[in-house]
Amino acid sequence: MSSIEKVAVIGSGVMGSGIAAQVANAGIDVILLDILPKEGSDRDAIAKGAIQRMLKTSPAPLMHQRNAKRIRPGNVEDHLEWLAECDLVIEVVIENLEIKQALYRKIDQHRKASAIVTSNTSTIPLAHLVEGMGEDFRQHFAVTHFFNPPRYMRLLELVAGPDTRPEVVSTLRDFGDRMLGKSVVDCKDTPGFIANRIGILWMGVAVRFAFEDGLTVEEADSIIGKPMGIPKTGIFGLLDLVGIDLQPHVESSMLATLPEVDMYRDIHRPSAFIEKMIAQGSTGRKGKGGFYRLNRTDGKKVKEALDLKTGEYHPANQSTLASVEAGRKGLRALVEHPDRGGQYAWRVLSHTLSYAAALVPQIADHIHAVDEAMKNGYAWKWGPFELIDKLGPQWFAKKLT
């Protein structure tokens, strides 16, 4: 197992800069490269700008601002020869197969013989990424899928190909665990790997059934939240956080690579309501609001929620669903409650948990890996199989029928 003493990150967007920051936090020197800017004379302006944003971003990607000094900015036109100094090159560019493969060919010309190359892809299978690449490149290639923000989200999904050398895998696992403080989960080379494969279906059913069952945004989030061991953002708050406009892209990428027979294909429905929100710029926290927004009334900030029927905002209300109160007694009490909240909880949980169960061993060899991925990638308190245990496996199987 070789050591990683210098790293290159190619792509200085939100994820790339976050990964570079976490590597720097580990006391490792980082080269951060990006494309040339369209305007201006500073050819390194994009990477330099990313480093400056690290110093201002909240929550802070850097443990201390001095760690920024470990990051050397550059560009992919002038500085690819710097890769010869690096033990690990992490690609974090746009999710476009042609762009990634063209970059790999350039990386292969400059990397040293022992250097490992990884991709932070979340949707493109490893087998597609290395198609047409030489044997040595394939032997030193893997997927290292970080979650945003990289400093705070503990999951690192590690995917090896059939040609990836065992020592490459062990080096990456040790680096992720010991140096970056990650929970490293071995995944199979399947669409969305583990966390996003399950997470995208979960988000899809939670949104679709909220519309179908006539729940308000506040009611849905009160169910898809503490009662299920999911962060208080719930489902609609989570979409606001990650960016509503990203969902159609993630969904289309997933649909392009999923098997022909898959539950997600059956439940996926494009939402005209959400498409209209995106067109209006209501993309969540980074836009002019989303399912929630902060509005100023009489000099005070007021949290408002979107009406899923009218598309108008109103002051956000606490949920009065009796099922939420019942959920304090346990998960089964929640899903057995007869009100629309209890019915909604069961529809979301039954689809999500049965989907997760059906994917083993397709996406991972062990159910523990699935639980760890959802807990550390989506911040669930319990993984899918732990949720089944809380409900009771026999009870759950019987209720499904």
Kindly give the residue locations of the regions a language model identified.
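N-terminal glycine-rich phosphate-binding loop for ADP-containing cofactors
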Residues: 1-401
